[in-house]
């Protein structure tokens, strides 16, 4: 059992024995010992600082392709979709996006601003945080090809900004400083890029033709 947490120190919502089936695309999974919905980045830092250092921490975006056992998750699950769900245009083709932003939402935003290549994000079923963690990609594009910088958080609640040179990035793999998690990133794109919402819709429709997006699904499965 997770050691007692001082609820008065945090502003977000702390749920106990939360069924993970409510938070995954597969609609299966036992209870998380604790699930925390932080109010914002500062509150997230306070939560981590007050959390016992022996308590495992897991991060949750939209729960795409996340399989949780019936026995649930021991430790703290942190759901970031709301607290880290902002997108901000910075100018000169740069866009900041929080780790909780759905990749499809990010794709549409960038295309509306005439920025690219960004339409490939529409083919990624998760959030920006997950895309950063594994260098997710689709339709020939990869997340880290567009990264200018990332904001990260450590277990002590400290926020830092890092650049791509501080990471080893490969196909569906990202290795960087230990004990840090992605809060979001600044992405760089070409302005007045030749793309359209129709292309984004076409990519989404291509996914729909291959996968039952409206039903609990594990997406594509490959046998090597």
Residue ranges and their predicted role:
Residues 94, 98-100, 147, 156, ...:
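Structured catalytic cores of enzymes that bind and process phosphorylated ligands/cofactors
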Residues 29-30, 48-51, 72, 81-82, ...:
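Surface-exposed beta-strand edges and their flanking turn/coil or helix-capping segments
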Residues 107-113, 117-148, 217, 223:
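A gly/ser-rich beta-alpha-beta helix-loop segment of oxidoreductase catalytic cores
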Residues 2-128:
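Anion-binding (especially nucleotide phosphate/pyrophosphate-binding) glycine-rich loop
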Residues 25-26, 59, 103, 120, ...:
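Bulky hydrophobic/aromatic packing residues
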Residues 27, 96-98, 119, 133, ...:
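Conserved beta-strand segments that form the floor/walls of ligand-binding pockets within enzyme
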Residues 29, 37-41, 67-85, 133-163, ...:
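Structural signature of FAD isoalloxazine-binding scaffolds in flavoprotein oxidoreductases
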Residues 15-16, 22, 66, 153-224:
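Phosphate/pyrophosphate- and phosphate-bearing ligand-binding catalytic cores of soluble enzymes
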């Amino acid at each position: 059992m997770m050691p007692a947490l001082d609820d008065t120190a945090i502003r977000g919502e702390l749920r106990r024995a939360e069924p993970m089936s409510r938070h995954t695309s597969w609609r299966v999974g036992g209870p998380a010992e604790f699930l925390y919905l932080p109010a914002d980045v500062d509150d997230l830092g306070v939560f981590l600082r007050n959390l016992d250092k022996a308590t495992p921490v897991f991060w949750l975006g939209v729960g795409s392709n996340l399989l949780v056992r019936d026995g649930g998750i021991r430790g703290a699950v942190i759901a970031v979709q709301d607290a880290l769900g902002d997108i901000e245009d910075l100018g000169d083709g740069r866009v900041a996006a929080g780790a909780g932003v759905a990749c499809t939402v990010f794709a549409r935003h960038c295309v509306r601003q005439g920025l690219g290549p960004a339409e490939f994000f529409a083919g990624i079923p998760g959030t920006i945080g997950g895309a950063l963690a594994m260098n997710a990609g689709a339709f020939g594009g990869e997340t880290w090809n567009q990264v200018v910088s990332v904001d990260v958080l450590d277990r002590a609640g400290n926020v830092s900004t890092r650049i791509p040179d501080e990471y080893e990035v490969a196909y569906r793999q990202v290795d960087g400083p230990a004990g840090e998690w992605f809060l979001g990133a600044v992405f760089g794109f070409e302005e007045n890029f030749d793309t359209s919402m129709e292309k984004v819709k076409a990519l989404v429709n291509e996914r729909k033709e291959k996968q039952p997006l409206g039903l609990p699904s594990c997406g594509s499965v490959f046998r090597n």
